[in-house]
């Protein structure tokens, strides 16, 4: 069949004369109507350094697609900067933007009957939003990452944006001067690219590489290097081959591909958000995958990489010593990666990485050998108990104690919590509860980077636990538990906790428990009332109405027609 198997419905035949007339106005010539139309989903934006370099990548992709005989059609999609909106009401729009990105790319690709899709992204929600769209469209597609930022430098230290968040806590604790606070601010983000540790953006780009939907070695490139533009060109050539062979996401996004993704996320020490986003993509791709699968993989895969936020190194340094392909090769050698999985290139994972050495380079400290891991098990533990019947996600890397039991300090918003921390209202041994920040209650599951960074900055990272039905930034570390489900707005037990209740986090036992008997919890439940929605109109109102539980990825299309399930 011809490569324009979808677009021919708008380019061929007498009846499509008006369609062709409009296409001529955007550059089509007679010979172009037989070519496949490839969408270039362009996430370029001057809102955030994460996306400011993507325009050049999209232009290079356009050029390369023309060179291989395709007709590229570039269109824009949105981004919301997590780092800039962090700690404000604006952060409620962040997770919502994932759905908007998915909807927008799907809408253009479906509406214009495109034959293939090259999606770009930089900031955190760009990645899962784009991949959800590729899964929905199920046309040949590839994701191209905008690249990571390089580290900033101040007084001999490598900086990331998280350094600036932690500096706030250090300053408030009297451990950092105003001049040094300004110095960190001015040097933390030196140029273009996504936040530089193994935070959410770099975690998701690595996961997509492991799934076979991005080019091998592309997930850790630096945005300002020519290599990023070279990746865009090569991705265009690979995509054209996929169009020719009708190689679609449904043949790549298999259950085993998701297992590969989670194995790599664990080995990298990646973001908690990977759990939420990969579950959302699995839901979209109609692949059965849940929190129990995540925990099963965690117990088998050690943390191999010493990367920020809990480690020492940044992603650009990781790239220099082999990056994600090297980690995948180590996992493959240990039988922890499905090497037979197909990729968008038409080759298997094993074919693409089999030539790499099964051990990391000896002259570096970023990637550890399998027999000397940073941690013997994965760092993203799934906790359950009377506080999280559907589950919760704990990030247990970079902490000294894996169990904490203490009095609850209860806050019904992130703002209240941060104010108390900065005013020394949270002490060692406390367990902080931040609720009504879930998918529906927030709405939008805000990331609690400001409170957790303030806790770290005050030197309480190993002494205070924090539990929320919201999320955490990929830059968060410490004794933190997020994605608590059911959320407070749905009447989950987190809504029933009272100030001073004893709450236990036990990562070794996978336990999240409030030490209150069932009778008392039922008494409290009988008095609890569903809060009035914070938003009743607009995109936040729609999201609050449609969002599924965090245990299902907080997607908006999970239960649209329950009566027909």
Curated annotation (Swiss-Prot):
What is known about what this protein does? Answer: Functions in the biosynthesis of branched-chain amino acids. Catalyzes the dehydration of (2R,3R)-2,3-dihydroxy-3-methylpentanoate (2,3-dihydroxy-3-methylvalerate) into 2-oxo-3-methylpentanoate (2-oxo-3-methylvalerate) and of (2R)-2,3-dihydroxy-3-methylbutanoate (2,3-dihydroxyisovalerate) into 2-oxo-3-methylbutanoate (2-oxoisovalerate), the penultimate precursor to L-isoleucine and L-valine, respectively.
Q: What is this protein called?
A: Dihydroxy-acid dehydratase
Subunit description: Homodimer.
For biological process, the GO terms are: isoleucine biosynthetic process; L-valine biosynthetic process
The species this protein was found in: Halorhodospira halophila (strain DSM 244 / SL1) (Ectothiorhodospira halophila (strain DSM 244 / SL1))
* Catalysed conversion reaction: (2R)-2,3-dihydroxy-3-methylbutanoate = 3-methyl-2-oxobutanoate + H2O; (2R,3R)-2,3-dihydroxy-3-methylpentanoate = (S)-3-methyl-2-oxopentanoate + H2O
Where on this chain does [2Fe-2S] cluster bind?
50, 123, 195
Gene for this protein? ilvD
A single Gene Ontology MF term assigned here is:
2 iron, 2 sulfur cluster binding
Question: Which family does the record assign?
Answer: Belongs to the IlvD/Edd family.
Q: State the EC number(s).
A: 4.2.1.9
The note on the cofactor says:
Binds 1 [2Fe-2S] cluster per subunit. This cluster acts as a Lewis acid cofactor.
HAMAP family on file: IlvD
